């Protein structure tokens, strides 16, 4: 009686136990002792501990969708799927040739003519009125900006407004101011020699504290000033009625008429004296 109650409880607690047809198994029930009589044998057999691992190598039996891919394959090779069997989504857009390299630009006449035809085939495109408004807006803005571009050159800010005048000398021009002593020494040298030599030029530059270039330029300017003065005197003499050659470059101060050079009053009082030669013969 006690043993049967234990078996019923054991069957409820361990549903995995199975009855054996032979009834010779004594799993789950032990003996009470060595001298006592053993309990009656139960008709249950112990089930395997992990029934869900039974038949794990046989994957074909557990596949509910049909035959598997075969025997055990490499663990690094994923199963291949045949993508050709799956049809792609239906294309609603028209096919565009890939070799057409001249695609119409947005806002161009070709694009405006192409817009309605492509809109008829594509349901997600803009309406015709919207495309026309975009084209008109683009043309309006381009027309509004083009006159301003033509009026304002990108290099207009670089152009400097220069007032054209007859004067060539500017205020920013660097000018050397000679001292009175330097001018006096240069004038003395000019009266002695109108064209200075290289040796004398270097000596003057050292003595006066100037550069040879400054001495050379001073002599050039001094000769130009003298030519201007001579030309001015010649023009004044021609206006008074005299006739003198007007080329000042070929006239030296000794060739000018006596009207330009006044003789001192002391020299005027002298009269030429006739000197008679007397020859004495023995």
UniProtKB/Swiss-Prot annotation:
Residue ranges of the region described as Disordered: 13-36, 98-156
Species annotation: Mus musculus
Entry annotated with the keyword Lyase: no
Keyword Lipoprotein belongs to the record: no
GO molecular function: DNA-binding transcription activator activity, RNA polymerase II-specific; RNA polymerase II cis-regulatory region sequence-specific DNA binding
GO cellular component, one term: nucleus
Biased composition (Polar residues): 110-124, 133-148
Lineage: Eukaryota, Metazoa, Chordata, Craniata, Vertebrata
One example of a Gene Ontology biological process annotation: blood vessel development
Major site of localization recorded for this protein: nucleus
Top-level division of the source organism's lineage: Eukaryota
This protein's name: Homeobox protein CDX-4
Compartments where located: Nucleus
Gene3D superfamilies xref list: Homeodomain-like
InterPro entries the record matches: Caudal_activation_dom (IPR006820), Caudal_homeobox (IPR047152), HD (IPR001356), HD_metazoa (IPR020479), Homeobox_CS (IPR017970), Homeodomain-like_sf (IPR009057), HTH_motif (IPR000047)
Keyword field: Developmental protein, DNA-binding, Homeobox, Nucleus, Transcription, Transcription regulation
Known DNA-binding region: 171-230
Biased composition, class Low complexity, residue ranges: 20-29
Family under the similarity heading: Belongs to the Caudal homeobox family.
């Amino acid at each position: 009686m006690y043993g049967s109650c234990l078996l019923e409880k054991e069957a409820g607690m361990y549903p995995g136990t199975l009855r054996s047809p032979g009834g010779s198994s004594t799993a789950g029930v032990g003996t009470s002792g060595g001298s006592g009589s053993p309990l009656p044998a139960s008709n249950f057999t112990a089930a395997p501990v992990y029934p869900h691992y039974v038949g794990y190598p046989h994957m074909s039996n557990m596949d509910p969708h049909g035959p598997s891919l075969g025997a055990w394959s490499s663990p690094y090779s994923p199963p291949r799927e045949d993508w050709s069997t799956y049809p792609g989504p239906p294309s609603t857009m028209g096919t565009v040739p890939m070799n057409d390299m001249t695609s119409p630009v947005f806002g161009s006449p070709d694009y405006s003519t192409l817009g309605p035809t492509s809109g008829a085939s594509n349901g997600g495109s803009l309406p015709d009125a919207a495309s026309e408004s975009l084209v008109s807006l683009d043309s309006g803005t381009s027309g509004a900006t083009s006159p301003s571009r033509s009026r304002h050159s990108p290099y207009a800010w670089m152009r400097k407004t220069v007032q054209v005048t007859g004067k060539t000398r500017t205020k920013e021009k660097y000018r050397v101011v000679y001292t009175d002593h330097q001018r006096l020494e240069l004038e003395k040298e000019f009266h002695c020699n109108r064209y200075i030599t290289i040796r004398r030029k270097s000596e003057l530059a050292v003595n006066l504290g100037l550069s040879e270039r400054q001495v050379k330029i001073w002599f050039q300017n001094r000769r130009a000033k003298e030519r201007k003065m001579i030309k001015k005197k010649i023009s004044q003499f021609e206006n008074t009625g005299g006739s003198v050659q007007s080329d000042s470059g070929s006239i030296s101060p000794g060739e000018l008429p006596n009207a330009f050079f006044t003789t001192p009053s002391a020299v005027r009082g002298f009269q030429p004296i006739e000197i008679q030669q007397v020859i004495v013969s023995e």
